Regions:
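Hydrophobic "anchor" residues on beta-strands that sit immediately upstream
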Residues: 22, 85, 125
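Proline/glycine-rich low-complexity loops and linkers
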Residues: 1-8, 99-159
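Short glycine/serine/threonine-rich phosphate/pyrophosphate-binding segments
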Residues: 30-35, 92-95, 136
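Short, high-confidence coil segments that cap the C-terminus of an alpha-helix
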Residues: 80-82, 123
Length: 159
């Protein structure tokens, strides 16, 4: 999977290497502790400040990537002088970013920011769950594409 990411035309590995990013990560002791550091190293990031990257499944804090659960990485951002922080949930299907000042750039904004970049270069339709922000719909329509909302899978499975 990492090689597939590196092969994407939208990923400028040389620019990432040249930027000399200092990156903090919190992988909540999930499988993200394996793939996230490996991906960052493959992208040329040399300084990675790791929190909770042992994938044993014993979460050191509530794994929901919301500000009140991310105080440790927010503090690390300042101490390490990191440029950006990444936090994943246990199954690594959600990503939150932490800005250099320790403030969370929420997962909803992350999705919309990435979608805006991708759609600018490779137009296409988008889909997200019903609990997502309307901003993805708005960005998708900005590029003349169609947006669809889908039921939240876990909720549907429980019902």
């Amino acid at each position: 999977h990492i090689q597939s990411v590196l092969n994407l035309d939208l990923v400028d590995v040389e620019a990432i290497k040249a930027a000399n990013f200092r990156v903090a990560i919190d992988c909540v002791n999930s499988v993200g502790g394996i793939v996230i550091p490996d991906l960052l190293y493959a992208l040329g990031v040399k300084e990675i400040f790791k929190l909770h990257c042992a994938p044993h499944g014993n979460f050191s804090h509530n794994p929901e990537p919301i500000p009140e659960n991310l105080t440790e990485i927010s503090d690390l951002m300042g101490h390490a002088k990191a440029d950006v922080g990444f936090v994943v949930d246990p199954d690594v299907d959600r990503l939150a970013m932490i800005c250099e000042n320790g403030v969370m750039y929420g997962e909803e904004y992350t999705l919309v920011t990435v979608a805006d970049y991708v759609l600018k270069h490779t137009p296409g339709n988008t889909v997200s769950n019903l609990s997502s922000t309307r901003a993805l719909r708005d960005v998708t329509r900005k590029y003349g594409m169609e947006y669809s909302a889908s039921a939240v899978v876990v909720k549907v499975m429980v019902e």
